[in-house]
């Protein structure tokens, strides 16, 4: 399964005059028809694809449980709380778990055994949380329709990517420029619907000049420019979660500042989910297009969007519950054609897209907790209106214990490397 992020292509935005009372009913009816049309168009042609994928997925109907003494996979099956497995699925998960030591041996760095802040290794080793490990491995297995060979290849690729990219470092040990921090927040609603408790928001209306943003923070920026921006960010942005400044390992960590910021946002959000809870083992994403004024997609944004989609698809499987596109201008339906034509999003993921040409989310998210601009309770007279940034929890998120061990190890390696260079 692919996890989707950003995307904007050629458009022209026409603002309608915020209507007279006499036309309000007609406008609301038109908007509702537009929402239905967009969602219908998005899902047209996908049902057969999803049905085909489902038909080919492994697993028959659950059979009666037998004793764990005769079926070792039954012990694994009992640890899974996010969903119900049949015996065949549990057997495959058991095989995948037992093969983890061999999988690690096939990676570029067998000592790197972390995914989403958890240690993925054999039972009995320090920091191995067996239920959470099993749930994470299940996501990789389910993403490939319970194909053990494909799941193994995906895991090897993910271990290698995490070892090289160091996403925990991006999330907890790097600072980013305020212009990037204003593009996204993380919210957590305790009373939210199932798997809508943790949400990452992408605020495209705050993207005032896409071309300049990606010249400064995208792949178009050279290393010297990125480092300079990171240093200036550390002086101007005191709200970051770490004392480090920017990509403080310089050229040793890959990716643009924009990419590292976006991956860091995802990693932080995952610290808030409970992989063993069927109601909170996935996150939602909301893309807000309010006040978007671009008339065409910037090439830098297009490249960054495709890169993020590919990274999420490979390395963050089965983690998206729903993706909302809100405040989408009536003329902006092209954006979903863009998502389909780039060819890196599965039909199953596209089915999770919901399109709204307004920002009223009170039917989906807790009204009492939402800002007024998203359909929440109006502020009392004289009280300042709450903004989405008032709900941002990203700076209070704590990393898992093993995640901290991984970062400490990375820091020790960097110190040793620097000492070797001095000597």
Swiss-Prot record:
Q: According to the lineage, what is the superkingdom?
A: Eukaryota
Record localization: Cytoplasm; Endoplasmic reticulum membrane; Microsome membrane
Pfam families per the UniProt record, alphabetical = CRAL_TRIO (PF00650)
Q: Which GO terms describe its biological process?
A: Golgi to plasma membrane protein transport; regulation of exocytosis
Q: What positions does the domain CRAL-TRIO occupy? A: 217-382
Q: Which CDD domains does the record associate with it?
A: SEC14 (cd00170)
As given in the record, the signal peptide range reads none
Example GO CC term: the record gives: cytosol
Q: PROSITE patterns attached here?
A: CRAL_TRIO
State the UniProt keywords alphabetically.
Answer: Cytoplasm, Endoplasmic reticulum, Heme, Iron, Lipid transport, Membrane, Metal-binding, Microsome, Transport
Molecular function (GO) terms listed? Answer: metal ion binding; phosphatidylinositol transfer activity
Q: Where is the composition biased (Low complexity)?
A: 20-30, 54-72, 232-248
| Reaction(s) the record says it catalyses | a 1,2-diacyl-sn-glycero-3-phospho-(1D-myo-inositol)(in) = a 1,2-diacyl-sn-glycero-3-phospho-(1D-myo-inositol)(out)
What cofactor is this protein dependent on? heme b
The topology of this chain with respect to the membrane is: Peripheral membrane protein
> Which protein family is it in?
Belongs to the SFH5 family.
Q: What is this protein called?
A: Phosphatidylinositol transfer protein SFH5
Organism ancestry: Eukaryota, Fungi, Dikarya, Ascomycota, Saccharomycotina
Q: Which gene encodes it?
A: SFH5
């Amino acid at each position: 399964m692919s996890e989707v992020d950003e995307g904007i292509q050629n458009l022209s935005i026409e603002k309608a005059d915020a209507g007279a009372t006499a036309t309000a009913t007609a406008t609301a009816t038109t908007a509702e028809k537009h929402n239905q049309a967009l969602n219908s168009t998005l899902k047209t042609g996908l049902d057969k694809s999803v049905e085909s994928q489902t038909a080919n997925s492994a697993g028959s109907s659950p059979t009666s449980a037998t004793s764990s003494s005769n079926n070792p996979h039954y012990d694994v099956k009992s640890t899974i709380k996010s969903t119900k497995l049949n015996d065949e699925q549990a057997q495959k998960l058991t095989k995948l778990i037992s093969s983890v030591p061999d999988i690690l041996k096939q990676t570029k760095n067998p000592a790197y055994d972390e995914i989403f802040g958890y240690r993925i290794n054999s039972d009995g080793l320090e920091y191995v949380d067996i239920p959470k490990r099993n749930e994470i491995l299940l996501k990789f297995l389910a993403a490939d329709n319970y194909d053990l060979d494909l799941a193994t290849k995906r895991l090897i690729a993910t271990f290698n990517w995490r070892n090289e990219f160091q996403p925990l470092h991006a999330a907890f040990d790097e600072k980013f420029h305020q212009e990037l921090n204003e593009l996204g927040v993380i919210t957590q609603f305790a009373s939210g619907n199932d798997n809508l408790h943790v949400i990452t928001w992408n605020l495209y209306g705050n993207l005032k000049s896409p071309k300049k943003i990606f010249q400064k923070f995208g792949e178009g920026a050279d290393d010297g420019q990125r480092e300079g921006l990171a240093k200036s960010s550390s002086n101007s942005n005191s709200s970051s979660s770490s004392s480090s400044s920017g990509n403080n390992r310089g050229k040793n960590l890959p990716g643009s500042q924009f990419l590292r910021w976006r991956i860091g946002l995802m990693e932080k959000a995952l610290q808030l989910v409970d992989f063993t809870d069927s109601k909170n083992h996935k996150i939602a994403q909301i893309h807000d297009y309010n006040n978007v004024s671009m008339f065409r997609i910037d090439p830098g944004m297009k490249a960054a969007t495709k890169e993020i989609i590919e990274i999420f698809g490979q390395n963050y499987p089965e983690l998206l519950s729903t993706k909302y596109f809100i405040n989408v201008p009536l003329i902006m339906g092209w954006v979903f054609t863009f998502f389909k034509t780039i060819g890196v999003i599965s039909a199953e993921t596209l089915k999770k897209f919901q399109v709204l040409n307004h920002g009223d989310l009170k039917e989906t998210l807790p009204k009492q907790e939402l800002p007024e601009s998203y359909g929440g309770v109006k502020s009392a007279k004289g009280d300042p209106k709450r903004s989405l940034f008032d709900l941002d929890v990203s700076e209070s998120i704590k990393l898992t214990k093993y995640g901290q061990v991984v970062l400490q190890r990375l820091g020790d390696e960097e110190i040793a490397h620097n000492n070797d260079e001095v000597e």
